[in-house]
């Protein structure tokens, strides 16, 4: 009775049902919005298709019932009372549906150089909402003929139709999380990013970086030292310039605010804002406007390449000497995701690295790519080839009977050249360990091919996002942190930066992190020689690597 009254009083007056026919063409279905679809039968037996949009600002999606802690979704309520809406028809079948539309737009191919690039991207985002459907989801089983009719209207192949059991959009959970707090077992234990033991509180950041390279590990350690780094740079009279790449930033970003402060304080501020960061385009367009209005020089990347690197360079002039402070990260400059994703942030006053970072920014300013650096690995022209060269070094060592090793931590591995070279390394006897969360196009453990390769994936509370490359052992060992996965889109079609870690303590820290991830027996899955992933069994003490890293960060602060 309560639901019926709610439907009749709150929902029925504002919904807009449509019956598809000669005068009512099949409506445009918006991307990721929910619709109720119904097969109607007239008294003469003729069938028609009815559609009701279920996303409406006129009513709440989550309907709270009188019984405490009980809810119903508005779309399910609409579906239930569809006979009341189409009362002149018999209801033959009904379902909730959702269409996913293509989000890929080739901005470079469509761009007209006579147009302002930012305005062009803003217009392109509007166009994306009308791209072709790539998926149709249904919550109820429907007759094949009806599904075919929907596919015809949407110009979609039936292979891309999926029936799902769960609600089509789970975002309603955020609305009830405060109520659910009364049931603590439904939630993770609270984890607060800890202070980094590598930085001394209350002291300027720059002298500490000059004294020794630093490494922050998110989300176990706080992003605050990096924020302090930017804040100090914005206000330090000796700072000449700040240069930075931005790919995805928070909607309320202290990082961007500090860049604005720096420009207003008379610093030279160069910011590369990647307007092609998918689904962040609108946010980036808005920030680019604010940065430009504050006096920052804003550039938008390269024709044909996305700039995905996480690079920041602060240049100081102290007592007539130029100093370079470089920060290189594996993840975005985003305060929100720094609490949710595992990432690394490396800071150094190494002059040679600083000069190469300056070379990267100079190339980006001139719409060019870097092709000659000694320390950094910079895609698209000198990351893949240097990685292949380092794998070759391990192959040569293995053939000479020496210990050879490769350790890789990343999100995905799809680059065929690198995969082929890793297979060659395995065949030569190089031991290879890989922690790859997502796509891995290399199958390990195949006799005569990849028997020396071990692949595991860790999916835990935090999204594994850091990239670590390890080549060699002992005095030959090279360790890098990077923004790039080994996918051709990263190695050949993006500007990416990998940084060498020379500090012995930081190298050891990264090695220990990698070994811990290889020992995870709670959230890890091991890939077998058939490409299947199996749970890594806990043979000894249970080890959740993410929990371990947090406990380590907490212990370092409290000791």
Task: Tell what function each PLM region has.
Residues 1-406, 424, 428, 440-464, ...:
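N-terminal localization/anchoring segments of enzymes in phospholipid and broader phosphate metabolism
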Residues 431-435:
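Hydrophobic alpha/beta core scaffold segments
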């Amino acid at each position: 009775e309560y639901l019926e009254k709610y439907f009749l009083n709150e929902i029925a007056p504002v919904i807009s049902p449509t019956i598809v026919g000669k005068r009512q063409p099949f409506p445009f279905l918006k991307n990721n919005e929910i619709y109720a679809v119904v097969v109607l039968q007239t008294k003469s037996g003729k069938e028609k298709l009815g559609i009701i949009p279920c996303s409406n600002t006129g009513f709440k999606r989550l309907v709270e019932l009188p019984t405490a802690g009980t809810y119903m979704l508005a779309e399910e309520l609409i579906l239930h009372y569809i006979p009341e809406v189409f009362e002149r028809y018999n209801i033959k079948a009904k379902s909730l549906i959702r269409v996913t539309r293509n989000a890929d737009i080739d901005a470079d191919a469509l761009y007209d150089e006579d147009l302002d690039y930012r305005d062009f991207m803003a217009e392109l985002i509007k166009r994306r909402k009308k791209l072709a459907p790539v998926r149709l989801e249904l919550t109820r089983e429907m007759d094949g003929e009806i599904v075919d009719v929907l596919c015809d209207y949407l110009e979609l192949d039936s292979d891309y139709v999926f029936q799902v059991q769960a609600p089509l959009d789970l975002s309603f959970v955020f609305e009830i999380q405060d109520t659910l707090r009364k049931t603590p077992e439904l939630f993770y234990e609270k984890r607060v990013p800890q202070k980094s033991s590598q930085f001394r509180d209350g002291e300027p950041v720059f002298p500490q970086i000059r004294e020794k390279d630093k490494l922050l590990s998110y989300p176990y350690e706080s992003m605050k030292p990096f924020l302090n780094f930017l804040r100090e740079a914005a206000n330090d009279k000796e700072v000449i310039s700040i240069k930075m790449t931005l790919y995805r930033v928070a909607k309320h970003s202290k990082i961007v605010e500090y860049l604005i402060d720096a420009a207003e304080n008379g610093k030279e501020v160069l910011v590369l804002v990647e307007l092609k960061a998918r689904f962040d385009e609108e946010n980036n367009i808005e920030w680019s406007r604010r940065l430009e209005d504050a006096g920052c020089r804003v550039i938008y990347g390269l024709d044909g390449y996305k700039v995905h690197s996480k690079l920041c360079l602060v240049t100081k002039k102290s007592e007539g000497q130029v100093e370079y402070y470089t920060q290189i990260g594996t993840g975005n400059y985003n305060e929100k995701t720094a609490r949710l994703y595992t990432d690394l942030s490396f800071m150094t006053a190494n002059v040679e690295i600083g000069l190469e970072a300056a070379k990267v920014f100079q190339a980006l300013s001139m719409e060019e790519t870097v092709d000659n650096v000694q320390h950094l690995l910079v895609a698209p022209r000198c990351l893949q080839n240097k990685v292949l060269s380092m794998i070759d070094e391990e192959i040569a060592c293995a053939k000479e009977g020496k210990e050879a090793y490769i350790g890789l931590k990343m999100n995905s591995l799809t680059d065929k050249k690198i995969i082929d070279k890793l297979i060659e390394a395995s065949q030569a006897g190089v031991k290879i360990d890989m922690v790859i969360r997502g796509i891995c196009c290399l199958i390990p453990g195949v006799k005569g091919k990849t028997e020396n390769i071990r692949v595991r994936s860790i999916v835990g509370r935090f999204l594994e996002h850091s990239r670590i490359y390890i080549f060699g052992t002992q005095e030959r060992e090279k360790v890098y942190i990077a923004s790039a996965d080994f996918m051709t889109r990263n190695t050949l079609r993006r500007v990416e930066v990998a940084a060498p870690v020379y500090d012995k303590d930081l190298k050891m820290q990264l090695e220990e992190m990698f070994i811990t991830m290889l020992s995870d027996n709670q959230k890890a899955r091991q890939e077998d020689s058939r490409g299947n992933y199996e749970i890594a069994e806990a043979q000894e003490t249970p080890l959740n690597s993410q929990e371990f890293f947090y406990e380590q960060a907490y212990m370092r602060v409290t000791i």
